[in-house]
Amino acid sequence: MSVVLDWSLIDDLRRAIARGRALPEVFGDVALGAAFELACACEAGDAALRDAVTRWSIASGVLRSSVRALAGHASPVPDPFGVPTSEIRPAPRDGRDMDDHLWTEHRERFHRSLVHLAGLPARTARAVGGAYAEMADNIISHASSDGSPTRSLVGFRVSSTEFEFAVADTGRGIRASLHERPEHRRLINHVDALDAAVRGGATRRAHAAGGGFNDLHIALADLNAVLRFRTGDAALTLDGRGADRIAARSASPMMDGFQLSVVCRC
């Protein structure tokens, strides 16, 4: 039986690679969030990790596209008015990119796919798309200390039974971002910093709540979803619907940046 590589396997897989253990030759499929995390891990990974990802990429278009997008290679521009099942691209690098027509068209395709493929009401699809855009904007706002671009990617995958979207960067991570405010320097480990940002609304900005994650929670409130947040050596998953989602914190092999993936069951 073919194995799907998703977030539940990704940390154990990275540990196995680091320890030189035997790895699967191929996966039946690679979830979007797992592909993004592997692409980011390759940035600082050793030869064994890069070789494994190269091998798996042969059979996984999602993983192959993720590695290329993180390296800054844009895929061919799709039909602006299409309804794609998936799309992966480099994340916007600055505010001008957020206003660029290619990014706007990408967001509109995601919206159409949510409505026509996943069957979401237009209002819900618009809220999900807005949260997706907010997560992409967070990369620009928080991934580096001086506002310089960092390697990052965004993407979605949609079917009639579920949809995924993910954002990832190789920047400084949540803890370093929060430490710009003195009151957050008490958050000395990554797992506490991650929890404070995602569930507590902590932010590096003095006069703002963590609106990005709040928008995400609001957009997904009525959807049955699994959210995975990962930074430094920490991961946080929220599983379920709205306020009843079950939170689980766990250790993750150390990696720079921040990675988020969302899977919603239609």
PLM region spans:
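Flexible, glycine-/charge-rich segments associated with ATP-binding catalytic modules
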Residues: M1-R21, D79-G82, R199-C266
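Amphipathic alpha-helical interaction surfaces in cytosolic regulatory modules
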Residues: V4-P78
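Long, mid-chain structured domain cores
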Residues: L49-V53, S57-G119
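Helix-loop-beta hinge of the Bergerat
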Residues: A91-L120, R175, P182-G200, I218
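Conserved ATP-binding N-box helix of the HATPase_c
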Residues: L120-V158, H217-L220
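ATP-lid-like helix-loop hinge signature
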Residues: N138-E180, A247
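Short helix/strand-bridging catalytic loops that position acidic/His residues to coordinate divalent metals
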Residues: R151-L153, H179-L187, G201-T203, G242-R249
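Compact recognition or signaling/catalytic modules
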Residues: E162, V167-D169, L178-R181, I188, ...
